[in-house]
Amino acid sequence: MPSQPEQLVDAEADSVPPPSAPQMPSKASRILLGLSLVLIAANLRPVFSSVSVLLPEIIDGTGMSSLAAGVLTTLPVVCLGAFAPFAPRLAQRFGAERVLLAVLVVLTIGTALRGVGSFWSLYMGATLAGAAIAMGNVLLPGVVKRDFPKTAAIMTGLYTMALCGGAASAAGFTIPIKNMLGGSWNLALAFWAIPAALVLVLWLPQALRSKHNVAHSGFRVVGLWKDPLAWQVTLFMGLQSSTAYIVFGWLAPILRERGMSPAAAGGLVSFSIMAQVVTCLLIPSIAVRQKSQSFINVFLCACASLALIGFLYLPQWSFWILAIIQGIGQGGLIAAAMMVIVLRSPDSHTAAHLSGMAQCVGYILAAIGPLVVGMIHSATGSFAASGLFFVILWIGASINGWLSGRARHVGARTINKEA
């Protein structure tokens, strides 16, 4: 079984020659590199949670329907799946550091574009930001693993905390920022371009200094897309991600419909996301010690889904308890879905390709969740009717979580093109 440092999937595993870590002559330059990577990670989630807490204001300000709002929350998730496959090839051609620089540029522009406040600028900004985040999602774990091989476990923890911290910060602070900016929801959305721009300035000299030899793919993996286990891993990734992006996109509006104030709803979502950190860090070390991860996966699905259903029907006094349960379940599912990719793969090349399959198909599947919730709300005028849909997601994720958790490898073969 892989040990803790092997959790991160290297998207450039097939590259020939393999990418090498940059030369860092001083401890300070190494600390700066680590800090920069963590800060990049922190900017990969505010796009989602900042929209969520302002969705009622966006609907009122633009006149869009709940269905159109569902499309707005869905667009970045679709982009996660659509653009993820391009990241490894771009890294082979230009180097991961320079691609991450482009990620920050596009992310800053896309986030700032939301400040225009028009219907189409919101959609365009969501698309650009989603495309950038897709690239960052794929490349950043491999860069962390490559540049910090001796401290991969610590960097994995910091990387995970940064992802959750960025999402939680946007959920918790966007409403206060809106109030500080005179009640302007569009400026509050655009505000999150500032931290992305600051990290861009920090990363720019490091990216330009990096040396890169043009690489090509020296390996191919055959049989993966026909393998039932690979599809079970992919469906598990997609269905648990669907629940996650429903939380990002719709939990705050659900809480506001149930009677919470905008600030309190944002604070509760932020609290729930921070609860994800605990199981994000703990589940991998627990999972690798088990022959099968099936029970863990099913248990986490129950926590995440039942708590989400509880927000629809249970009294308001229970919401903070539900937030903890949902955060524990969802955070564990994020880690578990990534772990089964590694554990079901016989080698690093298969893991990279299985990760690509799970992200490409899984995120497109995940995008259906927020869209369906928007459709249900548009048709019924209430979120209460979404409960049945949440149950369907729960059952689907549990079945595929159980199947993908079994101790076996996907039936795919790695072929060395150079041999």
Model-identified regions with their sequence ranges:
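Extracytoplasmic gate region of multi-pass secondary transporters
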Residues: 51-52, 228-280
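Helix-loop-helix hairpin linking two adjacent transmembrane segments in secondary transporters
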Residues: 119, 150-151, 157-207
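C-terminal transmembrane helical hairpin of 12-TM major facilitator-type secondary transporters
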Residues: 291-337
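Conserved MFS/SLC helix-loop-helix module at the cytosolic interface between two early adjacent transmembrane helices
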Residues: 82-120
